Amino acid sequence: MSSGAEKIVSSIMSEAQAKADAIIREAEDEAAGIVDEGEKRARMASERILESARKQADMRYQQIISEAKMNARRAELEAREEVIQEAFKKAEEELKNLASTSQEEYVSALRGMIKEAAVEIGGGDLVVSMREDDRSLDLGLDKIAAEVEAETGKKTTLKVGDSIRTIGGAVVRTEDGLIEVNNTIEARMSRFRKALRSEVARVLFE
C-alpha cells in the first residue's frame, strides 16, 4: 500500500475511533444518568414508604393511647358508681334500721312525710297507707290534718288505710284514689337520687 493510501486509511480509522469513543462516552453518560435517576427515585420511594409507615405508627400510637385513657376513665367511673351505689345501699339500710329501732325519731319523720304528702295533694279527705308495723302507731293524724288544713285552706281528714310493703314512710291518696303521693322512704330515695348522687359524689371524692 502506498504511503498516500496508508494516510487515508489511518485518517479514516482515527476518525472512526474518535466517533466510537464519543458514542461510548455518550452512552456511559446516559447510563450514569439513568442510574442516578433510578437511585433518586428509589430514595424518594423509600422516603415515602418510611413517611407513610411513620404516620401509620403515630396514628396507631394515638389510637392506643386514646383507648387506654378511655378504658381508664370507664374503669374510674365504674368504680365511682360502685362506691356511690354502696353508699346508697348503706343509707337505705340505716333508714330501715331507724324505722325499726329509733321509735321516737322515726315517728317524728313519718308524721312529717304524711303531712308533706297531704299538703302536696291539697288537703281534703285522705287515706294514709303504711307498713303493717306503723298502722298501730300513735301518729296524731287529727293534729296533722289540722296542720294540713291550716296550710291548704281546705277541710282535711286523715284515716289509716290498708298496709303496704315498704321499709318506712307512707302513701297518701284521696278517698276516690284519683290523686296519690308516694312518700315512702324508697320513693323519696328514688326521687332525690339524682340530687343525692351529686352530693354523695362530692362528699366521697372531693
UniProtKB/Swiss-Prot annotation:
Gene3D superfamilies found in the cross-reference section: ATP synthase, E subunit, C-terminal, F1F0 ATP synthase subunit B, membrane domain
GO cellular component, one term: proton-transporting two-sector ATPase complex, catalytic domain
Listed GO MF terms: ATP binding; proton-transporting ATP synthase activity, rotational mechanism; proton-transporting ATPase activity, rotational mechanism
InterPro entries: ATP_synth_B-like_membr_sf (IPR028987), ATPase_E_C (IPR038495), ATPase_V1_Esu (IPR002842)
Pfam family, one: vATP-synt_E
Key word Cell membrane present: yes
UniProt membrane topology term: Peripheral membrane protein
Primary residence: membrane
Gene Ontology BP terms: proton motive force-driven plasma membrane ATP synthesis
Annotated keywords: ATP synthesis, Cell membrane, Hydrogen ion transport, Ion transport, Membrane, Transport
Cell compartments where the protein resides: Cell membrane
Keyword Ribonucleoprotein part of the UniProt annotation: no
Quaternary organization: Has multiple subunits with at least A(3), B(3), C, D, E, F, H, I and proteolipid K(x).
Family as reported in the entry's similarity comment: Belongs to the V-ATPase E subunit family.
Function as written in the Swiss-Prot or TrEMBL entry: Component of the A-type ATP synthase that produces ATP from ADP in the presence of a proton gradient across the membrane.
Record's protein name: A-type ATP synthase subunit E
Organism name: Methanothermobacter thermautotrophicus (strain ATCC 29096 / DSM 1053 / JCM 10044 / NBRC 100330 / Delta H)
Classification of source organism: Archaea, Methanobacteriati, Methanobacteriota, Methanomada group, Methanobacteria
Protein's gene: atpE
